[in-house]
Every structure is written in structure tokens, then in C-alpha cells.
Amino acid sequence: MPSKPSKVLIIVARRYNGNELWTTLGALVSRGHSFTIASMALEIVDEVTGQHNLIKTLVEATLEIEYDALMVISGNMEDTEAYWTMPHVQSLVGDFYTAKKPIAAICCSVPTVRLAAKGKKVSYFPLMRSKELLERAGALPQPVSITVDGNLVTAENQMGSQVWAEAFCDVLEGKDPNIHLVDFGFRPGKRERKPMPQLERLKAITKATGRTRVK
């Protein structure tokens, strides 16, 4: 454990991703760190379960100097994208970056921290508009699910929440996250479809009998 536990500011979408948030809070608490959750409203909602939660901090009222690190949690796309351009949030990211404090973002929240990603590798949810924003900021998008580059920790999607949160705790504690991921080279695009014998037989039967269901 670090000699001094970190106090982490967690910015969440108003309609937040519950898997990302609760997994992150569990990791921070288990490692002895404290946190403050901030959002654009004091009532936030799990976008999947509809569970409402009351918090005490509006994101507009937060200051970098009061925290040791910053994390950004995604959720509803409209709410998540709002932080990409919200002046106070972008100013916060810049302040944390200038102060050399650890920063983490996951899924569609990664473009929110692009000001801290110049010259750094990042994982991100593969939307073209996300990639364009990141590249314009000088970030280096990666085709792997989780990336740690210095004190910046990013993840592609919620499936990596636990590893992402634990890796960030390692960074907070001055430890090597020890994440080794491999790019298998897959890229979405057009490719020749190979015929499937079973499907071709089914199509032939359907065409011959005029039936759409085969027993």
C-alpha cells in the first residue's frame, strides 16, 4: 500500500455505466483509496438498471488541487460526449496533466482526456469521431483493450473495467501495472464470404419447397 492513500476525483456521465462505476469503486476501496463522484447533476442514474443515486458534488465545482488523481467513467452516449467539450472538464484535464497527476478514462470517455494524451498510447472505444479527436490531440490510438502509458490509463470498453481500475491503482501506488496485451491484427473491413454447406442446403430446400421453416 502507498504511504498516503490517494483521493480520486471520478467524473461520471449523468446516466452512467454501472459496471464501470461500481467495479472501479470496489477496486479503489479495496486498495485503500478514497474518492469523490462528480457529475453534471446531483442525481445520477444507472443507464441499464435505472437505479437512481444521489451524489454531493457537481463537476463544475471541482478543482484539481483538491485531488490526487482523475478518472472518467462513461455511460449514455449523449452524456458521455458532453464532457468531450465541456469547458470546465477540459480545463480540469489540463490541470491534472500539468500537475503530472494520474489520469484514467474508459470506453467512450477516453476522448475527454485527450489533452493529457499527446504523444501517448491510448485504448478507446472505436468510433471514428473518437479516433479523430484523439489523433488531432496528438494521441496514439491502439488496437488493444487496455493501455498504460506513464500515468495515463485507458480502456476500450466495460469488459476491461476490473483490469483498468486495478492498473490505475498500481499507478497510484507507484507499481508496475504489468499489463501485456497483444494486437492480433484484426481490422474490420470487407472480406470474401466463404459458403457454409449447412446454410446452402437450407437455402436450397427453402427455394424448392417454398417453405421458410424446415423441420
Residue ranges and their predicted role:
Residues 1-103, 111-123, 128-215:
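Extended, subdomain-level signal for the structured scaffold at the beginning of enzyme domains
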Residues 107:
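Catalytic nucleophile serine of serine hydrolases
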